[in-house]
């Protein structure tokens, strides 16, 4: 086939050092993602920081959520949970939202002794037009009087705070597969097993339903009431999700979504690197595929098992690692991870974050450990949302056209490139190309001290050559079909600042997280347009080539 177009120019076209050929099938997958595919999980103890309260709502967080909502038509769903939901006890006389004590021997990142007061639930008023998942305490609630009393006291408060369409679902317990082995302190004996977990889960969720019927009857109805579960930490721990399902976890048929958690590796795990661990498509694929194997085992037990989501996930467990989880390379990992997950059947992904967490998409407040600001991973979230968003001609209120299906376009020659196609109403609407080859511009690759100009080498690039469906040939009237390219860019994969999406910045210091077009970044309308050309020798297919620099991504949109 004759490739008509070599590519789309970027500000300065680098020397092409490699090229890959990819064929794009016109047949769309049949498994669309849910609305608000890019969603969040906020650490329970950090929720007041992220959301604020009635007197002081966190408008920075609200702006960042609004950005995503304006792109996709639905704001991200917020799951409030994590390890600290299973430490939280209720104190009705507490004059503020949360009192937490950090024990460095257990965790230096979040409190492990926690009391919440009535005003904790004010935080659910801060984000407008947002749906929530609230986490109740099973860790202490299932085996301690104080924990059980907390459940009795907080269900009425939570349900009243989440009325009026705010509630999506509940959770009861976070990562119960680790209850007997947790590094932060076990809350169950070594004999803890799936049958005991299911017994305690059913006991607690039935009490929750009883309390809802008494206090918030509208939230006890079948159309509203439900859970995401089992929220296990992974597939390799002591408790196994298929066995828990077989023990009757969904006996009451109230689990809306099958939720699992995932981290590619650990913050202090030996051998973890940006290139080898995060910017590595093979690692991402293997990590996600293990969950598909597990989910298929659940489906074999129960063919009607609910849809699959990541209820909590991010790059490296234990809140991430500086120089890895907070870099632009982690943003590129997030794009690859989210879209590969979508391509194999995950319906929604909740990216986890907390105050001072290294992998967080943003830091909600200033602390003695971190400054308030938009972090690199958020830009990856924006890119994923832009890829999945309804095409411009499709109204947000039309489910048939607004929900995307995603196809993984395998590249077998290297683990450092990946590509995906998005379809709406069976029509190819976008491609995204991710160059995961690292390109560092700071000393030690930690994103802090820039290398001197004399130490910088030319930034490599790869040309993605596409064979497209015949529908992307010239039209009958001879009008060329135009594409627009939007780029996710930074100075290098180790950068922690200076990141842009299509020339836009979402930084706190510019306009509180609202999008600001940077004048020194080339605009799409000026230099990132191209046309799909006519093929000649392979059945009339069209060709397209796109150059993508190392440590960057490009979205191709058919217009």
From Swiss-Prot:
Catalytic activity from the UniProt record: a beta-D-glucuronoside + H2O = D-glucuronate + an alcohol
A GO cellular component entry from the record: extracellular region
Protein name: Beta-glucuronidase
MF (Gene Ontology): beta-glucuronidase activity
Residues glycosylated per entry: 53, 91, 99, 143, 203, 222, 280, 427, 440, 465, 491, 520
Protein function: Beta-glucuronidase that hydrolyzes beta-glucuronosyl and 4-O-methyl-beta-glucuronosyl residues of arabinogalactan-protein. Hydrolyzed heparan sulfate only very weakly. Has no activity on xylan from birchwood. Able to catalyze the transglycosylation of glucuronic acid (GlcA) residues from p-nitrophenyl-beta-glucuronic acid (PNP beta-GlcA) to various monosaccharide acceptors such as glucose, galactose and xylose.
The protein's enzyme class: hydrolase
Active-site residues per Swiss-Prot or TrEMBL entry: 194, 312
Family to which this protein belongs: Belongs to the glycosyl hydrolase 79 family.
Main subcellular location: secreted
EC number from the UniProt entry: 3.2.1.31
Keywords noted in UniProt: Glycoprotein, Hydrolase, Secreted, Signal
Location(s), subcellular: Secreted
Dependence of activity on temperature: Optimum temperature is 45 degrees Celsius.
Cleaved signal peptide residues: 1-19
pH dependence (record): Optimum pH is 6.0.
One family name in Pfam for this protein: Glyco_hydro_79C
């Amino acid at each position: 086939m004759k490739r008509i177009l070599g590519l789309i120019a970027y500000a300065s076209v680098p020397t092409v050092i490699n090229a890959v050929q990819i064929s794009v099938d016109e047949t769309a997958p049949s498994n669309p993602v849910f609305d608000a595919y890019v969603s969040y999980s906020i650490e329970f103890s950090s929720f007041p920081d992220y959301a604020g309260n009635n007197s002081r709502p966190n408008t920075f967080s609200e702006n960042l959520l609004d950005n995503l909502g304006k792109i996709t038509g639905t704001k991200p769903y917020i799951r409030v949970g994590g390890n600290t939901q299973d430490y939280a006890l209720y104190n009705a006389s507490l004059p503020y939202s949360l009192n937490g004590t950090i024990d460095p021997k257990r965790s230096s990142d979040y409190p492990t002794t926690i009391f919440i007061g009535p005003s904790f639930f004010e935080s659910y008023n801060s984000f407008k037009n947002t749906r929530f998942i609230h986490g109740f305490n099973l860790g202490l609630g299932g085996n301690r009087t104080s924990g059980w009393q907390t459940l009795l006291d907080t269900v009425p408060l939570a349900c009243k705070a989440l009325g009026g369409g705010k509630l999506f679902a509940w959770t009861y317990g976070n990562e119960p597969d680790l209850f007997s082995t947790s590094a932060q302190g076990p809350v169950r004996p070594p004999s803890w097993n799936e049958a005991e977990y299911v017994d305690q889960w059913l006991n607690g969720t039935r009490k929750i339903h009883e309390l809802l019927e008494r206090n918030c009857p509208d939230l006890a109805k079948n159309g509203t009431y439900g859970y995401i579960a089992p929220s296990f930490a992974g597939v390799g721990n002591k408790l196994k999700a298929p066995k828990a399902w077989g023990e009757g976890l969904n006996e009451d048929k109230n689990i809306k979504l099958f939720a699992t958690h995932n981290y590619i590796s650990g913050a202090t795990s030996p051998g973890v690197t940006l290139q080898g661990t995060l910017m590595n498509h093979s690692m991402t694929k293997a990590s996600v595929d293990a969950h598909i194997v597990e989910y298929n085992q659940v489906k074999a037990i129960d063919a009607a098992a609910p849809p699959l989501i990541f209820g909590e996930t991010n790059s490296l467990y234990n809140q991430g690692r500086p120089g890895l989880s907070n870099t632009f390379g982690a943003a590129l990992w997030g794009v690859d991870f989210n879209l590969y997950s979508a391509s194999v059947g995950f319906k929604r992904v909740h990216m986890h974050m907390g105050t001072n967490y290294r992998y967080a998409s943003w830091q909600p407040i200033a602390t003695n450990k971190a400054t308030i600001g938009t972090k690199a991973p958020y830009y990856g979230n924006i890119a994923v949302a832009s890829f999945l968003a309804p095409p411009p001609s499709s109204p947000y209120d039309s489910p048939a056209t607004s929900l995307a299906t995603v196809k993984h376009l395998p590249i077998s020659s290297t683990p450092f490139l990946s590509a995906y196609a998005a379809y709406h109403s069976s029509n190819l609407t976008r491609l995204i190309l991710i160059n995961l080859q690292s390109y560092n511009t700071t000393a030690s690759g930690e994103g802090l001290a820039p290398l001197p100009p004399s130490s910088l080498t030319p930034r490599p690039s790869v040309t993605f050559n596409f064979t497209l469906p015949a529908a992307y040939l010239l039209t009958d009237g001879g009008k060329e079909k135009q594409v627009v390219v939007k780029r996710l860019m930074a100075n290098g994969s180790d950068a922690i600042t200076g990141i842009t999406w299509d020339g836009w910045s979402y930084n706190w210091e510019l306009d509180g997280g609202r999008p600001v077009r940077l004048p020194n970044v080339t605009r799409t309308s000026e230099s990132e347009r191209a046309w799909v050309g006519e093929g000649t020798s392979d059945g009339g297919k069209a060709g397209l080539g796109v150059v993508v620099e190392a440590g960057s991504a490009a979205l191709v949109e058919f217009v």
